[in-house]
Amino acid sequence: MRVVVVVTGLVVVVVATALSLPDHDVKSASSPLSSSSVYQGSSGDDCDEGLPPPDRPFYVVWNHPDTCKRNRIPLHLDHYGFIFNKNRLFLGEEIQTLYNTGLWPNISETGEFFNGGLPQLFTHHDYSETVEILGRYRTENFTGLGILDFEEWRAIYDTNFGIMRKYQDESIKLAKQRYPSYNKKELTMVAEQEWDQAAREIMSTKLAIGQALMPGGHWGYYGYPRTWGSKRNTQLRNNRIDWLWRQSTGLYPSIYIKDPNMTESAIAEFVSGNVEEAVRVQDEFSPPNTPIYPYAMLQSGDHIFFQVDHLKISLGLPAKMGTSGVILWASSNRYKNATRQCSRMRVHIDNVLGPYVENLTQVMADCSTTLCGGHGRCVHNSHDVLLGETDSQRLSGLCTPRHSRFRDYHCRCYSDWEGACCQTVRPSRCHKQQQGNVHEGGDLQEGHVVNVVNPLIG
């Protein structure tokens, strides 16, 4: 089964059809086109058209509460080229990090089940609250970053460990009720299959609703993808949710450094690992040009601001690896003492962060223009997960003299360009079909239809 979310003049309709959704052999995903068309993706070999290319290769996006503006302590973000919402709002036309996206099944710390507790028992399949809530934040002609942030449980069954282990345990109990004669191994297999399918239905449908309400946005989930130990385990697990990468039009891994005692080498390994995996799944599964924006922080747990050495890792390293930018996020808890925090933040921006961001974004833009004709991003030879060391060395220097400051970089072209220097227009073999504004999502029960009036359109 698959979900189709249709936006008509006055309603948002979530429909389940009996069509099977391919799991591994087809590269299909929604794309933010006009309000009357749909992107029909196929495999990477058959379809080269993707999302629109960016106007600059790298941005730093500000996603802090608007506390400083409300307290009349201005932060000079515009002086240094940050991207931010109008009036410094947390939710706006450039970025929306959404925590409340309607009903989700979850189990409280005391063991109380809400909305079924487990995805398998989720009883609110009309998703009307999700439509209503996302409708409140609907921005006309939204082309920014749309992020759904849900962290109570994870999409992959066996990644629910630690404090999330209760979801595995309760899923096995549920399976035992249905299959009392099964042994533990068999029950675990059933629990895993049922969990993965139900989690997919919920996550995919909520993502599809956001895409339908604001089709020009780059939609995805916070913290996806991430690493899971070894590279092999990471790839095997993340390949199990390839449906999410195919549907997402933005990838938002987390590179938060929560342990202030981590060494620089450990931090670099952590950051590069998560960014590498995002680059891999984007290349293998997502629509071409799907942006990657890791979430990063400016302060450690004890409120000490990170200095340039750390910024070179949390901002500079993702830039070298070819991401679209980095989102700088902070909780409202950081601003409980607003006057002190905002005053310190302004000093940090003016003396450390701002000049670094301004220089970094300009360097990446200059490199793109010099090496790639503005038709791609520069990727450092030692940080390209998509190329082997020999390939990186072979490409190095093809587009710039050896004495150039960009001699250690090569081009990763946007989807409509190709060649070592992104100098050749790539013919597109995609076809835009006039089928209304449709976004395909995950599975629902056959015949299930939801017809919900959009509060902002109706």
From Swiss-Prot:
It is an enzyme of class 3 (hydrolase). Expressed by the venom duct. PROSITE patterns: EGF_1. Its main location: secreted. Residues 363-434 form the EGF-like domain. GO terms for molecular function: hyalurononglucosaminidase activity. Residues 1-18 form the signal peptide. Coiled coil: none annotated. Residues 24-47 are annotated as: Disordered. It holds the Pfam family Glyco_hydro_56. Keywords: Disulfide bond, EGF-like domain, Glycoprotein, Glycosidase, Hydrolase, Secreted, Signal. It comes from the Eukaryota. This is Hyaluronidase conohyal-P1. It comes from Conus purpurascens (Purple cone).
